[in-house]
Amino acid sequence: MQSSPLLEHLIENLRCLPGVGPKSAQRMAYHLLQRNRSGGMNLARALTEAMSKIGHCSQCRDFTEEDTCNICNNPRRQNSGLLCVVEMPADIQAIEQTGQFSGRYFVLMGHLSPLDGIGPREIGLDLLQKRLVEESFHEVILATNPTVEGDATANYIAEMCRQHNIKVSRIAHGIPVGGELETVDGTTLTHSFLGRRQID
C-alpha cells in the first residue's frame, strides 16, 4: 500500500536531523499525526521562526537574533581579557553550563581539515586574527575537540596568539569523573598523565 505523499515527504524531511534514520523518522511522523498534532504545529512554527530570524553574532559567531549576542554585549565579559575558542556553537552552551568561564568566545564553525578543503579562512581564522589585533585579550583558551583535527587547529591558533604575545592555554583532556582506568583508552590516559597537576 502506498503511503500519503505528504506523509512520505514529512518522514524524508525528519531524516535531516542527526541520528534520525528511516525508522525513527517514521515513528516521529506517526506520533505527531496520531497523538500530538498541536505539538507538531508548534514545532513547525518554532522551526520556521528560528530558521528565518536566527543568525550569527558579528563578534563571536554564536547563534543570536541580534547583531551581537548577550555574552558579547555583557560589559563584565568585555573587560575580562579572556577569549575561549570553540569549534561549534553547542560548545559554548556546554562551557556556560559549568559556570567556570566568565570571558568571551569565538566559534570556528569547524576545524582545520586540508584533505576536505577546510583551511584557515573557512573556519574564520582571519576574523579571529582581527579580534586578536583590535581587542585586548591577555589569554586565549583553546577548547577544540581532542581529535587530530582539533589538535592541528589548536596548534595553528596557538602560533597566532604567540605572534601577538598573548598567553595561550588549552583545556585539559582526560579521564571522565566516575570513569575506571581499565576502560579508558590509551590516548585519553596519556593526555591525563601529561595534563596532571600538582596537589598542594
From Swiss-Prot:
Keywords, in A-Z order: DNA damage, DNA recombination, DNA repair, Metal-binding, Zinc, Zinc-finger
InterPro entries from the UniProt entry: DNA_Rcmb_RecR (IPR000093), Rcmb_RecR (IPR023627), Rcmb_RecR_Znf (IPR015967), TOPRIM_dom (IPR006171), TOPRIM_RecR (IPR034137)
Keyword Zinc: yes
Zinc fingers, C4-type class: 57-72
Domain Toprim: 81-176
Gene Ontology BP annotations: double-strand break repair; recombinational repair
A GO term for molecular function: zinc ion binding
Family as reported in the entry's similarity comment: Belongs to the RecR family.
Function: May play a role in DNA repair. It seems to be involved in an RecBC-independent recombinational process of DNA repair. It may act with RecF and RecO.
Protein name: Recombination protein RecR
Organism: Haemophilus influenzae (strain ATCC 51907 / DSM 11121 / KW20 / Rd)
